[in-house]
């Protein structure tokens, strides 16, 4: 069995006291900003989806606010005239800690402090969370198109109360609060990656079952498709018995869990994060050894 169901399809919804009487949806349901024209919109979250949705909705809404429960670092889409991923590729020869140090320094110089924009200070080191890449959010905040808000405390009708003792009315709330690592076709007693580690060798080979494989069960700092392509190539070699499962695959899985590419916070998304360049190198190395 080859599992390719992805990890961005089962929405995770936040839970707050009270009941919101307006429209409440997840970013998974968001298609375009047009339906929110002339409405008061509150976006929850600080990741890429949240910031993109906030920017897009602010173009048509009567009001857009963005609620963060913690601080995030915003990375511009372009650094020194180059797309950020191109810039990151040029630094791929560096150790990950040094890359994070350099990228964080450049981002801080480019953006300044979050405090300038009314945003909370990041509570993690650069690289401890997935980067939020957006070149319009801070511009929109400084021009009054997006209003930063702290964490939500509770709902009462269309009124939203925040933890700084302020409250405002909204017509629409869009929760950009991530997704679960869900495999509903498996009994949870057999396999459950919703919580806890994901012990898969190269994020694809199960340590116990040699006929169960996963493609795309990783979160790269970059595009997922090249990595999924290399996994597919390695899978084809495994199915043809050209690539042999390591005899110590269980210990290799344990090592991947205990020694991740990057030390990040313990959430579903970050438990499957890989360093794009290192991950590609590891997969290509296994393919080369087999052929």
Sequence positions of predicted segments:
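Basic, ligand-binding patches in group-transfer machinery
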Residues: 88-89
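Short low-complexity, flexible loop/linker segments enriched in glycine and/or proline
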Residues: 80-82
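Long, charge-rich alpha-helical interaction segments
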Residues: 254-258
């Amino acid at each position: 069995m080859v599992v390719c169901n992805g990890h961005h399809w089962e929405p995770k919804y936040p839970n707050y006291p009270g009941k919101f009487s307006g429209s409440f949806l997840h970013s998974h349901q968001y298609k375009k900003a047009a339906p929110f024209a002339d409405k008061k919109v509150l976006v929850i979250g600080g990741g890429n989806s949240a910031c993109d949705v906030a920017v897009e909705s602010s173009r048509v809404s009567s009001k857009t606010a963005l609620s963060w429960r913690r601080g995030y670092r915003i990375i511009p889409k372009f650094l020194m005239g180059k797309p950020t991923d191109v810039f990151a590729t040029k630094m791929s020869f560096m150790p990950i800690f040094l890359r994070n140090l350099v990228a964080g320094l450049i981002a801080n110089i480019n953006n300044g402090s979050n405090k300038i924009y009314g945003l909370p200070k990041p509570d993690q080191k650069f690289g401890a969370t997935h980067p939020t890449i957006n070149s319009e959010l801070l511009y929109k905040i400084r021009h009054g198109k997006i209003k930063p808000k702290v964490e939500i405390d509770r709902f009462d009708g269309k009124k939203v109360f925040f933890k700084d003792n302020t409250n405002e009315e909204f017509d629409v709330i869009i929760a950009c609060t991530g997704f679960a690592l869900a495999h509903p076709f498996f009994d949870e007693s057999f396999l459950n990656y919703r919580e806890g580690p994901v012990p898969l060798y190269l994020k694809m080979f199960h340590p116990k079952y040699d006929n169960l494989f996963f493609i795309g069960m990783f979160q790269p700092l970059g595009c997922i498709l090249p990595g999924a392509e290399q996994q597919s190539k390695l899978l084809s070699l495994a199915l043809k018995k050209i690539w042999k499962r390591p005899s110590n695959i269980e210990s290799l899985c344990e090592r991947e869990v205990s020694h991740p590419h990057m030390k990040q916070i313990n959430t579903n998304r970050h438990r499957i994060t890989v360093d794009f360049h290192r991950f590609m190198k590891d997969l290509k190395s296994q393919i080369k050894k087999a052929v």
